[in-house]
């Protein structure tokens, strides 16, 4: 495999010249999907309505005082028709959303909730009626609390059977109208963030180091995710694929990576980071086993695939879902004092420290489009050029700061340019989804930060939506009225200047 470091020179060379080149929607393949994304807990609200049971995020967010939770969020459960109309007006070609396991199957297994089933059928029908392709994620961090309480969730192999049964219901009930299925969202980050720092969700307060074996649970959870994903994939291929003709995939959180210096130590550290952050999930999907460097580093802490499991995992993804926001320089300095407290044990295993390329605060981070281009080229060359969907990419800003979110429009423009470059250079990238369609309850920033192209007034009981400049830019790009090489973003800002305040 080519390490990430070998792409850095290529990416920097093209980034200086290519992102200002003209491109339009017509420069992408006809079947390429441009869309936007949300997730169930962050968008739906209605946390205890119509038979829904608590998820681990309901439990965890209720540890906070006041209304700092997703109980109502954007109220998408009641306002989905309004939101689909906004998508249609924008010209979205696809909408990515997740299905709440605890809304559809409240006990985690067994009885289907008819009102939950009807909601998702109606949402999919509404999307289809407006010519919008549903892209469905089965798991977006919101395990039914009942399964967490019963056996500990993803660290127990019982999750494989329960997740496969949940997927079976979804394929059976929605599969005629859904052709793109992502099994698990951000599998890498979910395992690291939920288990690697010992703060497992579904507890109030969340589990800490004294009650969780953080040295092993990250890798156990990741292993069980791969087995659950491959089990559900095998089910789909045997039972549904011939008739429904859909595709199934797994999503990873993909950091852009580059050596901090040209030293051998930093290049080697970057190779280790690539193995842990990409190869951990992607290599089993290609060859049926973990990267050698992970096996050498972790020893008995890394679970082992049986021969049968290896065969099942290999080839179990029709596509790779990429979630990308940040790019980092990698340096070989694993001293604990240099590693942030969150995820520190995982990065100690890597033996590396990640330094943000540009500003990377809670409310803002810089556009580093060469990072995404490098990711797409790396996956192409290291993992047999699989089909890729960029399932999330977007820019945070302080919520309620302005409707004229020019930095967000410029961010989206730059990253679409990076995708265009990667496709030109042979990447089989097939879709790009902005995070997010509207302002959401953010799992980290709560209501302080937002990514939406539509502003949501969370103080308004009606959750009024208002378009931002980025929504107008994306609309113009999709319908061909925005010339990316011109000053149209600036002109658009002037045109919208009369509605900049909230």
From Swiss-Prot:
One of its GO terms (biological process) is carbohydrate metabolic process. It comes from the Eukaryota. The active site is at 186 (proton donor), 392 (nucleophile). A beta-D-glucoside binds at residues 42, 140, 185-186, 325, 392, 435, 451. Keywords: Glycoprotein, Glycosidase, Hydrolase, Signal. The keyword Transmembrane does not apply. InterPro entries: Glyco_hydro_1, Glyco_hydro_1_N_CS, Glycoside_hydrolase_SF. Glycans are attached at residues 208, 359, 425, 457, 479. Residues 1-22 form the signal peptide. Its EC number is 3.2.1.21. It catalyses: Hydrolysis of terminal, non-reducing beta-D-glucosyl residues with release of beta-D-glucose. One of its GO terms (molecular function) is beta-glucosidase activity. Belongs to the glycosyl hydrolase 1 family. PANTHER family: BETA-GLUCOSIDASE 10-RELATED (PTHR10353:SF211), GLYCOSYL HYDROLASE (PTHR10353). This is Beta-glucosidase 7. The lineage of its organism: Eukaryota, Viridiplantae, Streptophyta, Embryophyta, Tracheophyta.
């Amino acid at each position: 495999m080519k390490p990430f470091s070998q792409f850095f020179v290529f990416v920097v060379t093209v980034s200086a010249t290519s992102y200002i080149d003209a491109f339009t929607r017509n420069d992408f393949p006809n079947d390429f999907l441009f869309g936007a994304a949300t997730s169930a807990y962050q968008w739906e609200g209605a946390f205890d309505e119509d038979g829904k049971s608590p998820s681990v995020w309901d439990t965890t967010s209720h540890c906070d005082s006041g209304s700092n939770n997703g109980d109502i969020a954007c109220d998408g459960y009641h306002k989905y028709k309004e939101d689909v109309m906004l998508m249609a007006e924008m010209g979205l070609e696809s909408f990515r959303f997740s299905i709440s396991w605890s809304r559809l199957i409240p006990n985690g297994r067994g009885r289907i909730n008819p009102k939950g089933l009807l909601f998702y059928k109606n949402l999919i029908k509404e999307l289809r009626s407006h010519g919008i392709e549903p892209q469905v994620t089965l798991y977006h961090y919101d395990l039914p609390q009942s399964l967490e309480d019963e056996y500990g969730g993803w660290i127990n192999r019982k999750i494989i059977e329960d997740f496969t049964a949940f997927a079976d219901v979804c394929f059976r009930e929605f599969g005629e109208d859904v052709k793109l299925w992502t099994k698990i969202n951000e599998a890498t980050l979910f395992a690291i963030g939920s288990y690697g720092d010992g703060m497992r969700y579904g507890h109030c307060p969340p589990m800490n180091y004294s009650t969780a074996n953080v040295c092993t649970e990250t890798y156990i959870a990741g292993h069980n995710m791969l087995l659950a994903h491959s089990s559900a994939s095998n089910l789909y291929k045997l039972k549904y694929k011939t008739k429904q003709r859909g595709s199934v995939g797994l999503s990873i959180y993909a950091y852009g990576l580059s050596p901090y210096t040209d030293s051998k130590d930093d290049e080697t550290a970057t190779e280790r980071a690539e193995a842990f952050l990409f190869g951990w999930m992607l290599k089993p999907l290609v060859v049926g086993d973990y990267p050698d460097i992970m096996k050498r580093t972790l020893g008995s802490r890394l679970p082992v695939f049986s021969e049968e499991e290896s065969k099942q995992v290999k080839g179990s993804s029709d596509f790779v879902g990429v979630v990308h926001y940040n790019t980092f320089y990698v340096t070989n300095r694993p001293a604990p004092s240099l590693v942030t407290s969150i995820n520190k044990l995982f990065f100690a295993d890597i033996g590396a420290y990640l330094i943000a390329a540009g500003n990377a605060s809670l409310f803002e981070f810089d556009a580093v489009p060469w990072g995404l281009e490098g990711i797409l080229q790396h996956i192409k060359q290291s993992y047999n050029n699989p089909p890729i969907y960029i399932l999330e990419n977007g820019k945070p800003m302080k919520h309620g700061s302005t409707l004229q979110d020019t930095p967000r429009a410029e961010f989206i423009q730059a990253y679409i340019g990076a995708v265009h470059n990667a496709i030109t250079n042979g990447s089989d990238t097939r879709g790009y989804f902005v995070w997010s369609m509207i302002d959401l309850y953010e799992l980290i920033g709560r209501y302080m930060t937002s990514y939406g192209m539509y502003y949501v007034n969370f103080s308004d009981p009606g959750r009024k939506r208002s378009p931002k400049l980025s929504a107008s830019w994306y609309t113009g790009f999709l319908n061909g009225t925005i010339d990316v090489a011109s000053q149209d973003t600036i002109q658009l800002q002037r045109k919208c200047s009369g509605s900049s305040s909230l």
